């Protein structure tokens, strides 16, 4: 209830609101280049940014990219109706895995364009096993998927409203290299040597990385695995 009262206080009577939703910080990085480009092309429009997780909200609640930043209330019929009626967005963009069915239904019902961006689908997901879940995707105006496999999966259940646009995190990373944040500890560790940094790695990534490290001992490496329990194992394998 606090979210709704706080939201109403700032968006009431506002116009041209475009709503972006990210689950967490990683999804925000995927959405960031899209928001930046949108603001550049539509300077009079206002950006509402919502998060599901505290990690995303707490770090980005004061971002200059958005006019307002909020948590997204739970995906219930009443919450979806209330939120959308309050915000009255002219278009909505959800990043990657985010499919909130009640919100999607209400957006479709009110003829508000809804875009799923940097989307990635995999075999075994409920959308490709059960008709009810596949039906929910009909509420998406257009999918911008990361890869050909995702496009093939959508096509296999009768969808053609998709574009293969890649992973927008690459756009974000390229932009970050033009204005890098200096980290003293990393600079000290690098000692003017080429340093390769790998973040949120998975087991399959690490198999390739370990072989690469063994073949290129002249470099320094910083690896932050997704599973923290794997740190000691990586240290042993890489002689780190």
Regions found by a protein language model. Name each.
Residues 2-6, 11-179, 197, 201-203, ...:
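Active-site and donor-binding regions of nucleotide-sugar-utilizing enzymes
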Residues 34-41, 207-218, 237:
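Short hydrophobic signal-anchor/transmembrane segments that target glycosyltransferases
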Residues 152-153, 184, 208:
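Short, solvent-exposed alpha-helical surface patches in well-structured domains
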Residues 223-240:
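Catalytic donor nucleotide-activated moiety binding site of glycosyltransferases and closely related
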């Amino acid at each position: 209830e606090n979210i709704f009262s706080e939201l109403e206080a700032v968006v009431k009577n506002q116009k041209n609101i475009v709503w972006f939703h990210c689950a967490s910080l990683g999804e925000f990085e995927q959405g960031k280049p899209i928001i930046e480009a949108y603001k550049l092309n539509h300077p009079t429009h206002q950006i509402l940014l919502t998060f599901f997780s505290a990690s995303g909200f707490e770090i980005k609640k004061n971002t200059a990219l958005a006019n307002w930043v909020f948590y997204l209330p739970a995906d219930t019929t009443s919450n979806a109706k209330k939120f959308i009626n309050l915000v009255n967005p002219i278009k909505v963009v959800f990043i990657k895995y985010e499919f909130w069915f009640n919100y999607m239904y209400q957006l479709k019902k009110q003829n508000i364009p809804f875009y799923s961006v940097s989307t990635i689908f995999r075999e075994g997901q409920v959308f490709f096993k059960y008709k009810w879940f596949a039906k929910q995707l009909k509420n998406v105006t257009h999918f911008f998927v990361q890869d050909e496999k995702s496009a093939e999966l959508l096509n296999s259940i009768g969808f053609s409203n998709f574009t293969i646009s890649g992973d927008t995190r690459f756009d974000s990373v390229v932009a970050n290299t033009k204005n890098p944040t200096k980290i003293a500890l990393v600079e000290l560790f690098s000692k003017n040597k080429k340093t390769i940094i790998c973040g949120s790695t998975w087991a399959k990534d690490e198999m390739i990385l370990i072989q690469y490290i063994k073949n290129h001992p002249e470099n320094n490496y910083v690896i932050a695995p997704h599973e923290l329990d794997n740190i000691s194992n990586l240290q042993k394998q890489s002689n780190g």
